[in-house]
């Protein structure tokens, strides 16, 4: 089948592999992106593929943490241009939307647009704001994390709202959680920077681990390693995969001698108790939204002829 320049571009962005290697892998995979990534990794050409992150839209991520640090809200509001995203009216709108979501019990954007705000339905409120600002604006998504019993939440915004994170921990005692509040903000900053795919090893689907074993075995076979040696090496490869892709296994950005789990454990112990991270949500502005092809795609097309 014909492989487009846009497909080659995306595969290059996700794997770091060369243009012709990407083209061949896509042809071998009949255009299936995930299969092409697997082919490149088995050949040892690609690193672990980045999540498809064709960031496109403008706007902002906003985070709100309740005064008692028991609930955190994260929301993405999109605009058509970055110019409007920097507009004070847009910023005020985002603040209002964020507060409204934090105080309501809505669970979906569809529900949100039917709720009352300032004596009108939210959908009508947004239409009026769009008319005032002069550009289409949409609440794309939102999430909340709330804790019951001994627990604490916090959040972090990176790059002026390009990335946002909320994270929660549970503790054996409330005073332990209170002592971890600031550390949890640092953990949220770590999540923004390191983008862990999973919370811990138990969160990784079994099929993902099996696929990593397959890829590791194919790489080692290519290097000429015998089967009995491959069998001994693979557990170490999987251990490294877990450490690099889970929040608790990653080295903490503010102290790379320790994992995030070690940092939390030690801080909780110093406060006279125990604690564990129970969940996190990370948003990156526009992730997953297709964007208009840039000139680079045309450049790739010219080189493929």
From Swiss-Prot:
Signal peptide: none annotated. It comes from the Bacteria. Keywords: Cytoplasm, Elongation factor, Protein biosynthesis. GO terms for cellular component: cytoplasm. One of its GO terms (molecular function) is translation elongation factor activity. Pfam families: EF_TS. It is found in: Cytoplasm. Residues 81-84 are annotated as: Involved in Mg(2+) ion dislocation from EF-Tu. Belongs to the EF-Ts family. HAMAP family: EF_Ts. NCBIfam families: tsf. Associates with the EF-Tu.GDP complex and induces the exchange of GDP to GTP. It remains bound to the aminoacyl-tRNA.EF-Tu.GTP complex up to the GTP hydrolysis stage on the ribosome. This is Elongation factor Ts. It comes from Nitratiruptor sp. (strain SB155-2). The gene is tsf.
């Amino acid at each position: 089948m014909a492989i487009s320049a846009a497909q080659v571009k995306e595969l290059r962005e996700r794997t770091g592999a060369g243009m012709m290697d990407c083209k061949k892998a896509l042809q071998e995979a009949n255009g299936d992106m995930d299969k092409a990534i697997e082919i490149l990794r088995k050949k040892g050409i690609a690193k672990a593929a980045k999540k498809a992150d064709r960031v496109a839209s403008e706007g902002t991520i906003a985070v709100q943490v309740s005064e008692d640090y028991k609930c955190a809200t994260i929301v993405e509001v999109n605009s058509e241009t970055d110019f409007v995203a920097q507009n004070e009216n847009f910023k005020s709108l985002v603040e209002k939307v964020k507060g409204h979501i934090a105080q309501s019990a809505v669970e979906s954007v569809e529900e949100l647009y039917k709720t009352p705000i300032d004596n009108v339905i939210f959908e009508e409120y947004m239409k009026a704001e769009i008319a005032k600002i002069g550009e289409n604006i949409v609440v794309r998504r939102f999430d909340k994390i709330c804790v019951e019993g001994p627990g604490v939440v916090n959040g972090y915004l990176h790059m002026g709202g390009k990335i946002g994170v909320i994270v929660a921990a549970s503790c054996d005692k409330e005073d332990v959680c209170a002592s971890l509040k600031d550390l949890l903000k640092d953990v949220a900053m770590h999540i923004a920077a390191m983008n862990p795919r999973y919370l811990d090893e138990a969160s990784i689907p079994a099929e993902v681990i099996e696929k990593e074993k397959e890829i590791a075995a194919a790489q080692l076979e290519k290097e000429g390693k015998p089967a009995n040696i491959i069998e001994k090496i693979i557990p170490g490869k999987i251990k490294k995969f877990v450490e690099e892709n889970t929040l608790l296994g990653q080295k903490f950005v503010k102290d790379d001698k320790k994992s995030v789990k070690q940092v939390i454990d030690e801080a909780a112990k110093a406060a006279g108790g125990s604690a564990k991270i129970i969940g996190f949500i990370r948003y990156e502005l526009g992730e997953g939204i297709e964007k208009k092809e840039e000139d680079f795609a045309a450049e790739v097309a010219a080189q493929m002829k």
